[in-house]
C-alpha cells in the first residue's frame, strides 16, 4: 500500500524536476554562413550554401525595423524571430526619402551626397542599421534588404 502512495509522489517530483533541468540547457546558435556563401543551385531552382547544404529562405518581414525600433526593441524582435525559426529578416533600408529612425536621425543628412554620411560622435541612421545587421548575425539570421518602399 505504501508503494502505491509513493508512485504519485515520485511522478509529481519528476514532473517538477524535468522542466527545471531542461531550462538550464542553453541552445547553441546555428550560424548558417559556416557552410559558405549562399548561391543559386546549378539547376537555377533553389538556394544552397557553397558546401552544398540546401538553404530554405524562411523570412519574417520587418520592413520598418530600422526606422521604428530602438536597439533594445530590435534585439528583442530579432531574438523572437530566431526563436520562431526564421532565418531571414526582410527590411527596408529607406521607407521614404529621407527616412528618420526612432532616434530622430535622418538617413540622408546631406541629400544624395554619401561622402559624409557618418557624423562623428553621433549614433546616426546608418550606425543603427549596422547595429541591426550585427545583432542579426550574432543570432544566426540573415538580413534581406530592400532599398526602398517608396519611389526615390
Regions found by a protein language model. Give the residues of each.
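Active-site mouth of glycoside hydrolases
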Residues: 27-152
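Bacterial Sec-dependent N-terminal signal peptides
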Residues: 1-24
Amino acid at each position: 500500500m505504501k508503494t502505491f502512495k509513493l508512485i504519485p509522489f515520485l511522478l509529481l517530483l519528476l514532473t517538477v524536476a524535468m522542466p527545471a533541468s531542461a531550462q538550464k540547457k542553453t541552445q547553441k546558435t546555428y550560424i548558417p554562413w559556416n557552410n559558405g556563401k549562399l548561391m543559386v543551385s546549378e539547376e537555377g531552382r533553389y538556394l544552397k550554401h557553397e558546401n552544398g547544404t540546401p538553404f530554405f529562405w524562411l523570412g519574417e518581414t520587418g520592413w520598418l525595423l530600422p526606422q521604428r525600433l530602438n536597439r533594445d526593441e530590435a534585439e528583442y524582435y530579432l531574438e523572437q524571430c530566431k526563436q520562431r525559426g526564421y532565418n531571414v529578416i526582410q527590411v527596408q533600408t529607406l521607407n521614404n526619402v529621407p527616412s528618420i529612425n526612432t532616434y530622430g536621425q535622418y538617413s540622408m543628412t546631406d541629400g544624395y551626397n554619401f561622402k559624409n554620411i557618418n557624423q562623428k560622435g553621433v549614433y546616426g541612421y546608418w550606425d543603427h542599421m549596422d547595429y541591426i545587421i550585427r545583432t542579426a548575425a550574432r543570432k544566426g539570421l540573415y538580413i534581406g534588404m530592400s532599398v526602398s518602399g517608396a519611389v526615390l
